[in-house]
């Protein structure tokens, strides 16, 4: 376990929310001209958390606690979470890297660090770390989901689907897992299976706007723009939905449209 970890260490419901969803969908389609990256990345459409003065104060308070005892794993996790809430994802990953080096057998730390590597785009390193964050005898569905996201970002869709399917055996019908699996099917050019899986995800009680937006995206890729717009209107205004459908039309017309999809997926809970 230390070998892989050392190698990684050395290779370094408001209007506002609806508007944010519209922007995020455009970003996911590759048409918004922004570099928004979603958490866990395990992908598509998600908000990063509060960027309020309270969030900054919490980060500053936790920074003091962390600097006083950087070996405390739980403080490191809390501090990294606060950094993420203020969009300091690279710093959060660095904090978790140091915590992992100090606590190489702490699977909670390794899991958090591995997920942070996915978030900052270090997918191959993430796979190395996440492999040590749980065991076949005691698998964690959230870690499996993150492994799936990393694999999907690397274009390894068959492997990604295997991780998502394994996670679903532990957490049946989890909407974020189903949505991520559906995105992977879409990236594999299997749009019918993608739609079937996305609809199952959207039908779950815990499904949120991100899951429904992913379903709308797949429907748009299949040319079913009216259906896509009807789904988007559940979470945004008619004008916003129409704008996003217009972007879907542009995406569907591109020869390489599937390459514009967000490979990471929807972040799992917890």
Question: Where are the model-predicted features located?
Answer:
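Terminal, low-structured helical/coil segments at or just beyond the last alpha-helical repeat
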Residues: 39-40, 205, 209-270
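Structural marker of alpha-solenoid helical repeat scaffolds
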Residues: 68-69, 102-103, 133-137, 170, ...
């Amino acid at each position: 376990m230390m070998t892989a970890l050392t190698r990684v260490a050395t290779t370094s419901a408001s209007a506002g929310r609806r508007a944010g969803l519209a922007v995020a969908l455009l970003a996911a389609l590759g048409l918004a001209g922004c570099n928004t990256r979603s958490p866990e990345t395990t992908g598509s459409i998600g908000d990063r958390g509060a960027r309020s003065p309270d969030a900054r104060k919490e980060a500053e308070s936790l920074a003091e606690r962390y600097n006083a005892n950087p070996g405390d794993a739980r403080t490191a996790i809390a501090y990294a979470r606060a950094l993420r809430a203020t969009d300091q994802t690279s710093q959060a990953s660095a904090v978790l890297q140091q915590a992992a080096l100090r606590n190489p057998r702490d699977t909670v730390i390794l899991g958090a660090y591995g997920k942070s590597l996915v978030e900052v785009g270090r997918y191959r390193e993430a796979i190395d770390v996440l492999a040590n964050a749980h065991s076949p005898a005691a698998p964690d569905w959230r870690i499996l989901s993150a492994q799936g996201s990393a694999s999907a970002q690397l274009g390894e869709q068959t492997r990604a689907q295997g991780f998502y399917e394994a996670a679903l055996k532990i957490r049946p019908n989890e909407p974020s897992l189903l949505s991520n699996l559906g995105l992977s099917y879409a990236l594999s050019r299997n749009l019918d299976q993608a739609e079937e899986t996305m609809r199952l995800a959207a039908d779950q009680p815990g499904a949120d706007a991100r899951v429904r937006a992913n379903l709308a995206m797949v429907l748009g890729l299949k040319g079913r723009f009216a259906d896509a717009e009807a789904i988007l209107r559940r979470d945004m205004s008619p004008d916003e939905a129409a704008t996003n459908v217009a972007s879907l039309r542009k995406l569907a017309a591109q020869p390489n449209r599937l390459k514009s999809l967000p490979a990471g997926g929807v972040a799992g809970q917890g």
